[in-house]
């Protein structure tokens, strides 16, 4: 039987998984890498760490699967918006990667907004003027690395999101490409026409010579170096992490929603061929592109989801492992009604306040680790409801009323029950929770002719558990109103 390698390059770790042609998981390898915080609000990665962790985990996963040379295709999924610029001749990065969480270009975004540029940018890219996206990060690098812009104009430097950089490394510098979903997150790509936007590139003084070729999500992206896996292997599927999860969750029908809980939380609502312009400051993006046909989505992005649990562990040191939050939340005094607004790197959708900072409301002398754990987990549910309320307001034909979930936090039954309670809708957790890697594997497998098309793949999606709302409507509304007051207070400071 043929096998597929899925590379999942995330914000805090790189993972690789081997699937067989029926998309059953055969092996997993994972490796964390350092986070770099040069200044408050700045977040960087060393691109060599990204590459070395990907190469190591890919080899390890293939070895553990014991597949005897039957590797037929590679799919890649990745943290989006993160920016790498490297030398064409050597492949060496000219600076650390600037990560999607980084806020250093907030002033630049503000000045562009004040100059009246946001409506044009939003109309073409579907995105808002925010440091989250790649474009202003690229400009910052070209402005601050000596000689970079001139070198880029001469064709000596290349830009890419993480997928593009990894493909360059995997292919030994033979392929400078990306896919439509990653391109759509740069704020340089016209999602209406499916091409790089010359006017926006000119506005930011970004030479178009450094941009990668854009392909479908299932397409030939290049062949790996023979020394990596013993022979050349085709890279046949690429999608940004949230779009890969959308595919892995089989959200192919307009109106279907999924929400992924990792470092951040990202909810996507499939809007089909309709490019819905948000009135609620959500993002209009490409869900996936197959056969040259773009399927669009509304997306809401929360910067801090699983990261709030990391804060409990690494910042407050009230837990040693993430799994401890479940027991603490269950044992907490719900009457205290503690509220945490985890705006550690600003507020994401639908607020988009990069300068806001986190706060805790309702502290008493009896507030302890259990109450903090409960409030931290609840904050993720509240933020998800913020996104879903905005989606429902934007698209009358929208949300079917069931939310499909995936990601590390979904292992917590307590968190998923609270999520169902606070959004007032069923939450479906799939049997296969590695939906991001699954989506990448499916894209590559479909292109290789090993896996079925969307309709047949969707028919095989399996439910592990449905969480139905149990909370009384009056309680739900009161708790959500309290959250709203807390968010407004944070934005007012």
From Swiss-Prot:
Pfam families, per the entry: FGGY_C (PF02782), FGGY_N (PF00370)
GO biological process, alphabetically ordered: glycerol catabolic process; glycerol metabolic process; glycerol-3-phosphate metabolic process
Alphabetical list of SUPFAM superfamilies matching this protein: Actin-like ATPase domain (SSF53067)
Database matches in InterPro entries: ATPase_NBD, Carb_kinase_FGGY, Carb_kinase_FGGY_CS, FGGY_C, FGGY_N, Glycerol_kin
Binding of ADP, residues: 11, 15, 263, 306, 408
This protein's pathway: Polyol metabolism; glycerol degradation via glycerol kinase pathway; sn-glycerol 3-phosphate from glycerol: step 1/1
Protein purpose: Key enzyme in the regulation of glycerol uptake and metabolism. Catalyzes the phosphorylation of glycerol to yield sn-glycerol 3-phosphate.
PANTHER family named in the record: GLYCEROL KINASE (PTHR10196:SF78), SUGAR KINASE (PTHR10196)
Protein name listed in UniProt: Glycerol kinase
């Amino acid at each position: 039987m043929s096998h597929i390698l899925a590379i999942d390059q995330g914000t805090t770790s790189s993972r690789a998984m081997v699937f067989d042609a029926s998309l059953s998981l055969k092996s997993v390898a994972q490796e964390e890498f350092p986070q770099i915080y040069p200044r408050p609000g700045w977040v960087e990665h060393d691109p060599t760490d990204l590459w070395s962790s990907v190469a190591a985990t890919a080899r390890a996963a293939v070895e553990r699967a014991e597949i005897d040379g039957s590797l037929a295709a590679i799919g890649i999924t990745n943290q989006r918006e993160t920016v790498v610029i490297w030398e064409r001749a050597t492949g060496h990065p000219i600076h650390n990667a600037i990560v999607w969480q980084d806020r250093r270009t907030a002033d630049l975004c503000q000045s562009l907004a004040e100059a009246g540029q946001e409506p044009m940018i939003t109309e073409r890219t579907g995105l808002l003027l925010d440091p989250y996206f790649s474009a202003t990060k690229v400009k910052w690098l070209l402005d601050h690395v000596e000689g970079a812009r001139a070198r880029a104009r001469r064709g000596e430097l290349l830009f890419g999101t993480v997928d593009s950089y990894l493909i360059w490394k995997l292919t030994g510098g033979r392929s400078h490409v990306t896919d439509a979903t990653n391109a759509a997150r740069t704020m340089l790509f016209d999602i209406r026409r499916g091409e790089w936007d010359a006017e926006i590139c000119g506005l930011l003084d970004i030479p178009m010579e450094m941009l990668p070729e854009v392909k479908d999500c299932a397409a030939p992206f290049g062949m790996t170096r023979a020394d990596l896996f013993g022979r050349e292997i085709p890279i046949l599927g690429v999608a940004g992490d949230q779009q890969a999860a959308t595919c892995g969750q089989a959200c192919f029908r307009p109106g279907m929603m999924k929400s992924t809980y990792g470092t951040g939380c990202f909810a996507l609502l499939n809007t089909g061929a309709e490019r819905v312009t948000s009135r609620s400051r959500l993002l209009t993006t490409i869900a996936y592109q197959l056969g040259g046909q773009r399927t669009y989505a509304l997306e809401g992005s929360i910067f801090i989801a699983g990261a709030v649990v990391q804060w409990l562990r690494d910042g407050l040191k009230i837990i040693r492992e993430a799994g401890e939050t479940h027991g603490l939340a269950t044992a907490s005094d719900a009457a205290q009604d503690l509220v945490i607004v985890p705006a550690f790197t600003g507020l994401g959708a639908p607020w988009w306040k990069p300068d806001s900072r986190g706060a805790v409301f309702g502290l008493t002398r009896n507030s302890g680790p259990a109450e903090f754990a409960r409030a931290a987990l609840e904050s993720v549910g509240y933020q998800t409801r913020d996104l879903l309320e905005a989606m429902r307001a934007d698209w009358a034909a929208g949300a079917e009323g069931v939310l499909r979930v995936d990601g590390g936090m979904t292992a917590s039954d307590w968190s998923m029950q609270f999520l169902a309670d606070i959004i007032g809708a069923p939450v479906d957790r799939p049997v296969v929770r590695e939906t991001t890697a699954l989506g990448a594997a499916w894209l590559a497998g479909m292109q290789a002719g090993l896996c079925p098309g969307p309709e047949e793949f969707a028919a095989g999606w399996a439910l592990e558990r449905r969480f139905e709302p149990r909370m009384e409507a009056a309680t739900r509304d009161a708790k959500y109103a309290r959250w709203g007051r807390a968010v407004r207070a944070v934005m007012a400071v």
